[in-house]
């Protein structure tokens, strides 16, 4: 396929996986289905640069030279030394069809959507960079979320009994539309969280974290340095 030329979406069947790692410059939508696959909806680079691999039940989708983090290359075209991204944002758009999904790692600045309702005992989510991540519905006993950077996470429906959030940087989390019992927050930086739990929230903050919450949970303050703000909302 030629880079930048529109074509009919291609679907690749893959081995069984329960965990997905999506690398920078790739935008993904996740849907539940009966057969596990990756559909390439749009691609702006040479297809040979795209890798879709499954090892130890982990699906990895990445581009050459940008497997883990965004990469830059030197540019002297204007008479002075500079750099530009190795690829454009949204160089690849994919749809991932899963049967079981328990672990998700997203890297870069793309927008990602978990379109189908996800049900798991424990769901682990890691976000690196400035991604915008939305779950239409998540139901789990426990959610373990770690955000590195300025990413935004929105949970639109569901029930997660125990919610654990660790934020490094200025991440924004909105789980107001899901219900839960307890939450534990550790924030390094200026994270902003909006939660809806019934029993207990414990927050530890190193920086100017903000917590907005619905319901009447017990608020437990751990160590905190900086201007931590806590607000009850209707």
Where do the model's predicted regions map?
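Sec/Tat signal peptide C-region and signal peptidase I cleavage site
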Residues: 5-9
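Acidic (Asp/Glu) and glycine-rich low-complexity loops/linkers
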Residues: 10-126, 137-146, 156-163, 228-234
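Short beta-strands and strand-coil junctions in structured, solvent-facing domains, enriched
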Residues: 28, 112-113, 132-133, 152-153, ...
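Short, surface-exposed interaction patches in beta-rich subdomains
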Residues: 153-234
